Amino acid sequence: MNNKIKTYLSQYAIYFVLLLLIIVIAIKDPSFISVRVFKDILVQSSTRIIIALGASLAILIGGADLSAGRLVGLAAVLSASLLQDPNYSARFFPHLPQLPLLVPLLITAIVGLLFGLLNGFVVSRFNVPPFIATLGTMVIAYGADNIYFSLPPNNSQPIAGLRKDFLELGTGGFLGIPYVVIIAVVITIIMWIIMNKTSFGKNLYAIGGNREAAVVSGVDVKKHILWLFAIAGTLYAIAGALEAARTGGATSEYGTMYELDAIAACVVGGWSVSGGVGTVPGVIVGVLLFTVINYGLTFIGMNPYWQLIIKGGERV
């Protein structure tokens, strides 16, 4: 009986914590319980959920992907630079013709995919720990981002003046539901299917649980590692483009520390850092918990320095 209770608490404790947190903030300020607030929380969580889903893949095999934040930043700058309004005076590419919306987004996704493949290649072919490999990629991506961002005529100025159709992707919605939330839900469903209903996802759990046993059972570990990082890189790029659309611009500092938030959300959501354990719903609740804390503390007017202490404590 005690073991059943412990198992139940370990699986669902975070859901109770999230509910309790909402109740506490609502008691402090009842206006917190509103459609507007919940919509804001969902919008702010959407890109973080996509990033965390990507980061969870490396955690599943007992690693950590530190390149997430910088790939988000690179994707934000790249997509924003290609999707400025033709009439904007300070365009990144003054003579670039207006491209169909999907073309720059596809280019951005491919860049993320290539960086992900680089991560996967280094980890799978040279047996470099994911932590080390992605640390190197993080620095490479940040350097590439700043070089690109500093190109004339932009010269490291914040990229603004984005096209209306791109901004609509980040701020608009369908039937009252923001597009970014819809995209996050679709990606979440796809990732759940991949992780639970495909041999690829099941093999990742096997690799994380016992790599030697997975090899003996015929799993191509190197191939799976290569493609898990490719998927992660693509997700980071999608999130970066959505961040640019949501905020109306981009700088080379976008995505700073996002990888740590993503890893923390996964761990809080029940993912084991030793690998082999974790669920997609756990990622979602982990991200929502952090978003509610961050949004809620600001909502009730807490001193910013106390917010930093609490945010640090929640990660501990």
Where are these regions (language model features)?
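Helix-loop-helix "hairpin" substructures at the membrane interface of multi-pass membrane proteins
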Residues: 100-108, 115, 119, 173-250
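Transmembrane helix-bundle core of multi-pass membrane transporters
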Residues: 126, 130-197, 224-227, 246-255
